[in-house]
């Protein structure tokens, strides 16, 4: 049967990895065996073992690729922005959904030592990217000269909390609306600015 349908079994490595990525970032890895993965992917176990020696290593490999792609998406969005303030907004919007990893996948990643390091490295890279954009905003005279590390940590900390489903349910907000309002708060502050006097 396989011989008569070569196209059905000869997915490119890129297409195969894309399908595998979707499976693992949706389901996580703790509930799956290599055998179940092979069955779901309609492939041999050997093809999975060619990527990594264990299911945990396979999962971490996939997650690392997703996180790196997510960072690059954020940087690309920032590069297209006309100034530093809009670059920060574009960067955060582009990295909005914590990489597309489901709650199950994030939980599994946190439970694996190498997975925690991968995610910590990703968060650190996000902070560093944000810091450089804030520094550029100060140089452009668009932002007040606050400590860039403090501001970037505050933004990322809030981003983590704003994704919380309980918070979103309690406020009745959608995640995109919550982030938009938060960015407005960061860029414009809490204080009402007096209107310019009419001539």
Regions found by a protein language model. Give the residues of each.
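Short linear capping/connector segments at secondary-structure termini
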Residues: 107-116
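Short, amphipathic alpha-helix enriched in basic
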Residues: 11-40
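C-terminal peripheral helix-coil segments that are non-catalytic and often amphipathic
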Residues: 1-3, 128-139, 164, 171-199
